[in-house]
Structures are given as structure tokens and as C-alpha cells.
Amino acid sequence: MATFKKFNKDKRPKRNTQSLLFKRKRFCRFTVAGVEEIDYKDVDTLRDFIGENGKIVPARLTGTRAIYQRQLNTAIKRARFLALVPYSDQHKI
């Protein structure tokens, strides 16, 4: 019968977790710019908040406040409906 060596976690080299993940402070671009309402016709701004695969980037990644994230969602959906912004990444403009 084979005997197994017990794995000792203490002998593993320690990693510096802060150097692996550099987190910069997120801020809301719309708050800084003083935007009151996000317009669906501003396609350049909307494209910054759409991922490579065509999905809307969540607020926890962009740092957008909840009020502006809701406006951003409706603006992107309106722009998609009017064919200003593609639904997915396969439709290139």
C-alpha cells in the first residue's frame, strides 16, 4: 500500500497580492463632467461603455454611479434599436 506525503502549505513561497493586482481608484466620468442626462445620440461616449463582445460594461468595472448607469443602459438600448450602435461584436460599423 502506498503512503502519501502530507502537503505542507507553509513551505510554499508567499506571493505579494498587491503587486499582482494594481487597483486604481474608479471615478464617475459623468459626475466629473457635470452631465445631467446621457444622450443616446452621443455614440462615441456610449462605445466606451460597451465591451468587446457587445455587452454593457457593469458599473463596478467602470465606476459609474447608479443614476448614470441606469441612464447609460437606456441610452445604449435606444441607440441599438436605432442602429447607431451594434447589438453584438459581429456587426462592424
From Swiss-Prot:
Which of UniProt's keywords are assigned here?
Answer: Ribonucleoprotein, Ribosomal protein, RNA-binding, rRNA-binding
Read off the InterPro entries from this record. Ribosomal_bS18, Ribosomal_bS18_CS, Ribosomal_bS18_sf
Stored Pfam families: Ribosomal_S18 (PF01084)
One Gene Ontology MF term: structural constituent of ribosome
Q: Which domain of life is it from?
A: Bacteria
GO BP, one annotated term: translation
- Which SUPFAM superfamilies has this protein been placed in? Ribosomal protein S18
Q: Name one GO cellular component term.
A: cytosolic small ribosomal subunit
Q: Which family does it belong to?
A: Belongs to the bacterial ribosomal protein bS18 family.
> Main role?
Binds as a heterodimer with protein bS6 to the central domain of the 16S rRNA, where it helps stabilize the platform of the 30S subunit.
Which NCBIfam families does the entry link to? Answer: S18 (TIGR00165)
Q: Which proteins does it associate with, and in what oligomeric form?
A: Part of the 30S ribosomal subunit. Forms a tight heterodimer with protein bS6.
Q: What is this protein called?
A: Small ribosomal subunit protein bS18
